[in-house]
């Protein structure tokens, strides 16, 4: 990532093994019921995205966690519909939420987006708003978890670290609100 003095970032991404999934590799995986599975938009928008979604559709009792990232606009509509039919927990930043709202014909206003998301997909949603914290929406609850005060040095990796914190919280049995709180804490340490 290239960071300009004003904090604007430009990413140069190159695909590697993470986008080379094949049927043989997936067939060897044992996924226990109740597992959390992380997928990135880079994987889902790559040529192996179709294969990953086909594999996901066959799994029972798992929670997909999807961080679409900047590739949210690159996933074909039909594949995106199949992904959302798996009722994943989706984590978006502010810009990605705007793109998602447009793609799914939902409101871009965060609280309305969350309500409409629940009505349309019955799946959890996290919207990360940098220093304003993160909103979470689920069938059970919704709310905004404030960000932790921090001295921002470098925001590269903030979204990934937030995802890691949320996943660690969920894997530990925390409810979504507390998992988002942990994600906020981890992201504040990284930036």
Q: Residue spans of the language-model regions?
A:
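Short, hinge-like loop/turn segments at secondary-structure boundaries
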Residues: 3-8, 81-85, 107-110, 141-144
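Conserved beta-alpha-beta core of the PfkB/ribokinase-like small-molecule kinase fold
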Residues: 36-111, 132-134
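Conserved N-terminal subdomain of the carbohydrate kinase-like
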Residues: 1-39
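Conserved phosphate-binding/catalytic region of the ribokinase-like
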Residues: 58, 102-191
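A residue-level structural signature of the nucleotidyltransferase/glycosyltransferase Rossmann-like core
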Residues: 18, 63, 89, 124-126
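Short, acidic/turn-prone active-site loops that include or flank metal/cofactor-
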Residues: 15-18, 70, 95-96, 148-150
């Amino acid at each position: 990532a290239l960071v300009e003095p004003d904090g604007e970032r430009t990413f140069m991404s190159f695909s590697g093994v993470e986008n080379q999934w094949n049927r043989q590799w997936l067939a060897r995986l044992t996924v226990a019921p109740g597992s959390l599975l992380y997928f990135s938009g880079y994987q889902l928008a790559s040529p192996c995205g179709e294969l990953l979604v086909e594999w996901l559709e066959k799994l029972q009792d798992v929670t997909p966690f999807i961080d679409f990232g900047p590739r949210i606009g690159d996933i074909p509509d039909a594949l995106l519909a199949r992904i959302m039919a798996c009722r994943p927990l989706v984590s978006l930043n502010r810009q990605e939420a705007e793109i998602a709202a447009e793609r799914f014909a939902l409101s871009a206003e965060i609280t309305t987006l969350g309500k409409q998301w629940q009505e349309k997909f019955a799946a959890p949603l996290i919207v990360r708003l940098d220093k304003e914290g993160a909103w979470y929406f689920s069938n059970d609850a919704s709310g905004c978890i404030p960000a932790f005060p921090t001295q921002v040095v470098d925001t590269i990796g903030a979204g990934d670290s937030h995802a890691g914190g949320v996943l660690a919280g969920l894997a530990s049995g925390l409810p979504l609100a507390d998992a988002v709180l942990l994600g906020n804490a981890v992201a504040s340490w990284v930036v």
